[in-house]
Amino acid sequence: MTIEINGKQVEAYHLIMKKENALDILNGKKKVEIRAFSEKYNDLFIDKKLYKEYQKDLENPNGSTTIEDTLKDTAYIYFTNYNKTWELIVEILDIAVYQMTKEDIEVLNEDYDFHDLDNEWQQYKDLTEEEIPMFYGLGLADVVSHKGVIS
């Protein structure tokens, strides 16, 4: 979607969120947004042209492209609820692809003080790397604007 920031039209991801989470972002408690590594979010976050190049690079034993190299360069998220009774625009610090591993969960702990998944990774520890679930972590920077979040 396109939104206006400082008089300029810019691209933004449109994500649905509960109001309580939006309030946590406004209050500085929530610093990362987690989304499933699913077809819906892959279509939203991944640049299809870059992904084709990534697929070719996987066949090369010396290939160095990572899945993160295929992510779109979008700088903002437009959060709202289904009814659009409120909105919150946040600048994106970064987007990364994580796996449900102890190491990746520790990165989220350290970088974002995020602990919602602390007890989840253990159920996947005996799986192969290909079987371990992946997910997106969108690091949140500054709140650009908000409307209707605070009643």
Sequence positions of predicted segments:
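Structured alpha/beta reader/binder surfaces that contact nucleic acids or chromatin modification marks
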Residues: 2-151
